[in-house]
Amino acid sequence: MIKLTARQQQVFDLIRRAIERSGFPPTRAEIAAELGFSSPNAAEEHLRALARKGVIELAAGASRGIRLLGLDDAPHQLTLPHAALMQLSLPLVGRVAAGSPILAQEHISQHYACDPALFSSKPDYLLKVRGLSMRDAGILDGDLLAVQKRAEAKDGQIIVARLGDDVTVKRLKRRPGGVELIAENPDYENIFVKAGSAEFALEGIAVGLIRPGEF
């Protein structure tokens, strides 16, 4: 059994909670802020120590490139055939026309070859984020959100959903009589959707994030 120091265990537990809650790991800056480190460099030192002990894997050049290893009960651990471990080819979805499938050919601007270690689970596509409604969850305008197609999501997960003619990224919160789509920015209002609404459709859950300049 791998023995971690108390501080390393705190970092490891924080990473695991972040993945379970939002679908992707925290940045070095977020780890430092949460655990009271003096700087992101201190978080980086603990991450490298965890990587040396074989409990996480780090992807070079990506602030969220952290993957948990060796967890038999971890639903977020990425498992792929050996031939797929080198890279994933993911379509990048730009603007989505009303009434047409997200992965319709006209929405795909290009494909990216991605390291699987960037993601908490195998994604199906990348969605270019527009706006700052999820800013406080670390999701910014222009980011590429990795999305796994799902018909259902757990309470608290960050989701991609259709709402009328729009596609939106929000945190899902179940409420009596429906669901609330939570914005992670006080400048934006939350959206309540009644159960059975024909205007609402879940498209998938967030499983990772790529920021231009870090890719």
UniProtKB/Swiss-Prot annotation:
| Catalytic site | 133, 170
By its UniProt entry, which CDD domains does this protein fall under? S24_LexA-like (cd06529)
Gene3D superfamilies found in the cross-reference section: Umud Fragment, subunit A (2.10.109.10), Winged helix-like DNA-binding domain superfamily/Winged helix DNA-binding domain (1.10.10.10)
Identify the DNA-binding region of this protein by residue numbers: 28-48
Keywords of this entry: Autocatalytic cleavage, DNA damage, DNA repair, DNA replication, DNA-binding, Hydrolase, Repressor, SOS response, Transcription, Transcription regulation
GO biological process, alphabetically ordered: DNA repair; DNA replication; negative regulation of DNA-templated transcription; proteolysis; SOS response
Q: Where is this site: Cleavage?
A: 98-99
Q: Would you indicate the residue range of the signal peptide?
A: none
* Cited InterPro entries: LexA, LexA-like, LexA/Signal_pep-like_sf, LexA_DNA-bd_dom, LexA_repressor, Peptidase_S24_LexA, Peptidase_S24_S26A/B/C, WH-like_DNA-bd_sf
Q: Does the UniProt entry include the keyword DNA damage?
A: yes
HAMAP family listed in its UniProt record: LexA
Q: How does it assemble?
A: Homodimer.
Q: State the NCBIfam families in the record.
A: lexA (TIGR00498)
What is the documented function of this protein? Answer: Represses a number of genes involved in the response to DNA damage (SOS response), including recA and lexA. In the presence of single-stranded DNA, RecA interacts with LexA causing an autocatalytic cleavage which disrupts the DNA-binding part of LexA, leading to derepression of the SOS regulon and eventually DNA repair.
The entry's family comment says: Belongs to the peptidase S24 family.
Name listed for the protein in its UniProt record:
LexA repressor
Tell me the organism: Burkholderia thailandensis (strain ATCC 700388 / DSM 13276 / CCUG 48851 / CIP 106301 / E264)
Q: Which gene encodes it?
A: lexA
